[in-house]
């Protein structure tokens, strides 16, 4: 275990230890070539940012914000801010002008760092409406800054405020030469000494599924406690190569990336989530945090290949998965030693067929893969373990600085649970089976939201999560968001997320919103995976002029109904989807139907598609 460092000096302490070893793997904006940055280079850039922020007039506990996708400069900026006790606030790269204006005003942001052209254009337009905002700093050098914008500068020019000459760092002598040229480094080091665990590190704005935006306050003390608590059960280390899939705005990715850096692992910065599988095949990571939807898509793709395979090849694939499931689920997950004949059979299939599946994903050197953020289908979880990948299922919130509970690598676990609570997190089940939390990693509250804070914490200091769940044999099981639970007109309770996760394993389903509240039966709005559906239509001679016509075709509806019925076989009658509508377009953030983390805003969907929903309940 590494020596724990305050985030303000973490990168510099690691540079002393690891020097010229690669710390970050990344691609420059617009480039397809992967490059690396050493710990020494990382440290120097962070110091330059710290010096530049002081020269811009930033004072301790004032705020900057980063409005960008994952990139190298994002990390430089965050850790540079921590070095001078400045609060760094991440904005989702997809945020609207209205959202960023609200957050800038609420937090009093002084400097806004932006990524690409789209983010700069939004920032430029709202700048006159944000009286606290002094400057815009642009990461991507190809961005066209308006000729009428005296307030924006490129990141390279920003760095020159921290040091007159931005050179590359090749060795220790370069490091000393550049550091000697940092104009305010002595002040930076004084601020390192003043840094404390009560300082605000980040404010993370969560829009939530109900649309109300609130800033979660995260302190250095919370990060410190989270690093210690996670280190016991999440064994990332110096030899790991950790790829980023989720945006750094997401607390799961942020906390996970900081844990990896704390342990001396190398970070692989993936900028575009849509290119993650290509990035994995090119960089061969050992670890990655993700949401279940990533693994659902992997499962669907592998399942489709098996279905398309010929007789003997298909049988071999199916046998390999069956053996992998028996070995990893029936024995290892329960802490039991597999019998010798099963060990031998698994070794054979693992070295041949299962290793090919992992190679296709770029995961030949796989270590483990934390997964959280939504319900994981048992079918998908079993599949991931069956192909020989260690999925660590967990549960957490922004308010808990990510992890509340997780599986422990090498220890028994139960499919369907979200693991065991971390040692320093106290979990209690309250009224309506609500999960309550208390501990050092839990937020002190929401920024400027005193009334909301009074509601969120009870008199004993427990934070009310709004999630329903239960504890069994020391493991935590999730039921549903309490606000999302539907009650049919017949008095039956429906958990929409659980039902949706069952259908999302089908290769024809891209998005689904279950409808049931105060209705006499369950229905659903389903967005098909159009590429797969259109290919199916062509193969079966089904002509269509557009997606709307395709979605209404009786043959398509019959095929989808049969697939849904198959997936629902083990469910109670009242839980089953009785009617559904295929949607000719996706649910979107632009229409307010999805959060920035792509979760459904059910109330908006129900409002936007009221007529479509009502039609499903007509006699």
Show where each model-derived region lies:
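Conserved pre-ATP/AMP-binding loop-to-beta segment of ANL
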Residues: 19-22, 160-205, 212, 235-241
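Conserved AMP-binding/adenylate-forming core of the ANL superfamily
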Residues: 24-71, 75-79, 96-101, 154-157, ...
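Conserved AMP-binding A3 loop
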Residues: 36-40, 192-193, 201-227
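Conserved AMP-binding/adenylation subdomain of ANL enzymes
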Residues: 224-241, 248-351, 355, 365
């Amino acid at each position: 275990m590494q020596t724990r460092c305050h985030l303000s000096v973490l990168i510099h302490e690691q540079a002393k230890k690891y020097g010229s070893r690669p710390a970050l793997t990344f691609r420059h904006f617009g480039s397809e070539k992967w490059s690396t940055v050493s710990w020494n280079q990382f440290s120097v850039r962070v110091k330059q940012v710290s010096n530049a922020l002081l020269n811009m007039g930033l004072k301790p506990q004032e705020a900057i914000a980063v409005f960008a996708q994952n990139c190298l400069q994002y990390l430089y900026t965050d850790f540079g801010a921590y070095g001078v006790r400045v609060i760094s606030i991440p904005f989702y790269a997809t945020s609207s002008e209205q959202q960023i204006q609200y957050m800038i005003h609420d937090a009093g942001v002084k400097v806004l760092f932006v990524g690409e052209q789209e983010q700069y254009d939004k920032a430029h337009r709202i700048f006159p409406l944000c009286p606290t905002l002094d400057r815009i700093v642009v990461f991507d050098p190809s961005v066209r800054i308006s000729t009428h914008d005296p307030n924006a500068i490129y990141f390279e020019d920003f760095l020159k405020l921290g040091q007159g000459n931005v050179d590359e760092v090749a060795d220790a002598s370069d490091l000393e030469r550049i550091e000697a040229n940092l104009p305010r480094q002595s002040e930076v080091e004084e601020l390192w000494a003043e840094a404390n665990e009560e300082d605000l590190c980040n404010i993370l704005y969560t829009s939530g599924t109900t649309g109300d935006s609130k800033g979660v306050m995260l302190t250095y003390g919370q990060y410190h406690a989270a690093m210690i608590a996670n280190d016991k059960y999440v064994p990332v280390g110096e030899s790991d190569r950790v790829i980023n899939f989720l945006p750094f705005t997401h607390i799961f990715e942020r906390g996970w990336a900081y844990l990896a850096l704390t342990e001396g692992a190398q970070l692989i910065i993936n900028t575009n989530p849509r290119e993650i599988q290509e990035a994995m095949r090119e960089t061969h990571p050992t670890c990655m945090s993700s949401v279940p939807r990533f693994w659902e898509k992997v499962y669907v793709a592998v399942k489709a290949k098996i279905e398309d395979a010929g007789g003997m090849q298909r049988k071999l694939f199916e046998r390999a998965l069956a053996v992998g499931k028996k070995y990893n689920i029936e024995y290892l997950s329960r802490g039991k030693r597999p019998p010798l004949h099963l060990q031998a059979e698994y070794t054979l299939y693992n070295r041949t067929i299962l290793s090919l599946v992992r190679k296709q994903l770029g995961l030949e050197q796989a270590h483990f893969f934390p997964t959280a953020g939504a319900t994981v289908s048992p079918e998908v979880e079993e599949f991931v373990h069956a192909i020989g990948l260690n999925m660590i299922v967990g549960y957490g919130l922004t308010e808990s600085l990510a992890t509340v509970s997780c599986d422990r690598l090498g220890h028994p676990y139960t499919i369907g649970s979200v693991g065991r609570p971390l040692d320093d997190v106290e979990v209690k089940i309250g009224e309506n089976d609500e999960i309550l939390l208390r501990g050092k990693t839990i937020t002190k509250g929401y920024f400027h939201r005193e009334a909301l804070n009074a509601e969120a914490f009870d008199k004993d200091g427990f934070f009310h999560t709004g999630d329903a769940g239960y504890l069994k044999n020391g493991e935590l099981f999730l039921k549903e968001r309490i606000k999302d639970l539907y009650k049919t007109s017949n008095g039956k309770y429906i958990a929409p997320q659980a039902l949706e996760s069952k259908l999302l394993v089908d290769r024809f389903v891209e998005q689904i919103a279950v409808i049931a509240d105060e209705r006499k039966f369950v229905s659903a709005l389903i967005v098909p995976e159009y590429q797969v559906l259109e290919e199916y239509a062509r193969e079966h001679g089904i002509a269509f002029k557009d997606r709307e016509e395709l979605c209404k075709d009786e043959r398509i509806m019959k095929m989808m109904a049969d697939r849904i019925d198959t997936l629902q076989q083990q469910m109670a009658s009242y839980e089953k989807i009785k009617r559904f509508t295929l949607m000719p377009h996706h649910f979107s953030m632009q229409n307010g139907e999805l959060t920035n983390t792509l979760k459904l805003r059910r109330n908006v969907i129900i409002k936007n598609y009221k007529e479509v929903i009502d039609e499903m309940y007509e006699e």
